[in-house]
Design a protein with these regions (language model features):
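Carbohydrate-active catalytic/glycan-binding domains of CAZyme proteins
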Residues: 1-529
Length: 529
């Protein structure tokens, strides 16, 4: 039996996907940048329905930048990049590089659900692709513009002394972006490197290099150049995976504006000359058919409304156990958040003075979903201090939010934002300016229900904010402020996220409680037939 799913495969920010199959099960690793815990590991039985099974990475490194230790020190847009997921002789591997520490890390596990172990490698392997050959020797393809293949030692701790270490291709110096995001495979005795780039004057494309041996000449061919009729954003950067029946699929990603970089799936076969033939008639299909899973569908959602993931044997909350779809912005300061101090609520304590949302500790985030996501939460601001802000955000570099704030002993409801200077992907590197106020009113109570609607339809990329009395759920939603842009930029280098936050501008010690969170993603496209 086959099922048909429309692209994107998953309409959310899962950048730099790497997918492998072990037995009848597919596994995916994805970039998590500055969010903690990181390196999401997902599982699927049909390449369409995915569930979280682990975060392979607790933290990248215990540094001032990763901890948001002080203003001027952050890991935005850096952290955990481009994982390479492999399984070899009973061990699971994830290799990735962190640009803030300029270090490559290898994660290993006996079970993909964890626990995972972390160690550093000798050398820095940018956008690395791990590969085990038939003789168990390990290699990594890596680099930007200039791609190299480097043999690793048997301990996988660094380069093999005297081993293979060679340049396999050099991109055109005039390319808008050189080769990167590479994955290395072997099929029917040939070696394949999938890699993406921006040829001069073109969109993002995927190339494939093919050779008869790792020390032989690699032939290069563009294998897909298409934007799925979506605003010129090319589909690229990924690899290939087969089914138990021997069918092949290519997986890549596509920039989709404010929602981020989303996984794309397409059929693939090998041509008579050995090169992959990707898509349908040279194009990425709007929908793709895959074999239906022979087992029950996954039960763990990739988004949701619950804070708590599990309870202990006595029925109480396992402290610090959040659902896997929640991640903190940077390394959390655990003494300043709790799931147990107020039953059913996520509580934040103010632990330092911050100039704006980008510097706030313990902002709790969840991915938005295209084409539309709606988030609601009740915020109790009765124990805020003057100058505190607690609320619901469209969390990105040019953030916006609706929040309760305390001023001169009065509780106010405000919409604030960081202005978008232009639509380019480049950051203005302004982390410190205070937010701009769009609208502000007196709050009817210290406890209010807040709502954000994130609209990504056809790159509209706007968020609108609403409020109502928390004690009268039948009351109508009242809009506050104007619509705000959600622009994907390299400052955060991630899609816009839902954010629950508290920060102080005058004194520490304030408390905010968040409860009855509700997540919904009305999906206007048919996912399955």
């Amino acid at each position: 039996m086959m099922i048909t799913s429309t692209n994107p495969m998953v309409y959310t920010d899962f950048p730099d996907p790497d997918i492998i199959r072990v037995g009848g099960v597919y596994y995916m690793a994805t970039t998590t940048m500055h969010f903690t815990p990181g390196c999401d590991i997902l599982r699927s039985y049909d390449l369409v329905h995915w569930e979280f099974i682990a975060h392979a990475l607790n933290i990248v490194a215990d540094t001032p930048e990763e901890r948001l230790e002080c203003e001027g020190a952050n890991a935005y847009g850096r952290g955990m990049w481009a994982p390479s997921l492999r399984y070899h002789r009973g061990t699971w591997y994830v290799l990735f590089a962190a640009n803030d520490t300029h270090t490559s890390y290898l994660l290993t596990a006996d079970d993909p659900c964890g626990p995972w172990r972390k160690r550093e490698l000798d050398g820095f392997y940018y956008d690395s692709g791990l590969f085990f050959d038939d003789d168990d020797r390990a290699y990594v393809v890596h680099g930007q513009s200039t791609l190299r293949i480097t043999e690793l030692n048997p301990e996988l701790s660094g380069p093999m002394p005297g081993g293979l270490d060679r340049v396999i291709v050099q991109d055109d110096p005039q390319a808008d972006l050189g080769y990167e995001g590479s994955h290395l495979y072997k099929h029917d005795g040939r070696y394949y490197v999938f890699t993406c780039h921006f040829p001069q004057g073109k969109g993002k494309t995927e190339a494939c290099l093919m050779a008869e041996s790792l020390d032989g000449a690699f032939e290069v061919r563009e294998i897909i150049e298409d934007d799925l009729s979506f605003h010129g954003y090319g589909v690229a950067q990924g690899g290939m995976v087969d089914t138990p029946d021997g069918d092949w699929y290519a997986f890549m990603m596509q920039d989709r504006g404010g929602v981020g970089r989303v996984p794309i799936l397409m059929p693939m076969r090998f041509g008579e000359d050995g090169f992959p033939v990707v898509g349908e008639n040279g194009k990425v299909p709007q929908s793709v058919s895959v074999p239906a899973a022979s087992c029950a569908e996954p039960v763990t959602p990739i988004n949701g409304s619950e804070f708590i993931a599990r309870y202990n044997a006595e029925g109480g909350v396992d402290a610090n156990c959040l659902q896997p779809y929640w991640q903190f912005n940077h390394i959390p300061h655990n003494e300043y958040w709790s799931l147990t101090e107020r039953p059913g609520a996520f509580r934040l304590h103010s632990g330092r003075i911050s100039s704006n949302l980008n510097h706030a500790w313990n902002t709790l985030t969840q991915r938005t979903m295209g084409p539309v996501t709606v988030a609601e939460v009740t915020v109790d601001a009765s124990t805020l201090h003057d100058g505190d802000f607690a609320g619901l955000a469209a969390f990105q570099g040019c953030y916006s939010y609706i929040a309760l704030t305390r001023r001169n002993g009065r509780t106010m409801l405000t919409v604030q934002y960081k202005p978008v200077n232009d639509d380019s992907i480049f950051s203005d590197d302004d982390w410190d300016s205070p937010a701009v106020t769009d609208a502000e009113i007196m709050a009817d109570a210290d406890c209010m229900r807040l709502r954000a609607v994130y609209d990504f339809i056809d790159c509209k990329d706007e968020v609108t904010f609403f409020y109502r009395d928390a004690d009268t759920p039948e009351s109508e939603w009242c809009p506050l402020g104007t619509a705000h842009r959600m622009v994907f930029k390299m400052d955060h280098f991630t899609g816009c996220r839902i954010g629950l936050f508290l920060y102080s501008t005058k004194e520490t010690g304030g408390i905010a409680d968040f409860y009855d969170f509700a997540y919904s993603a009305p999906d206007t496209k048919e996912r399955e037939q």
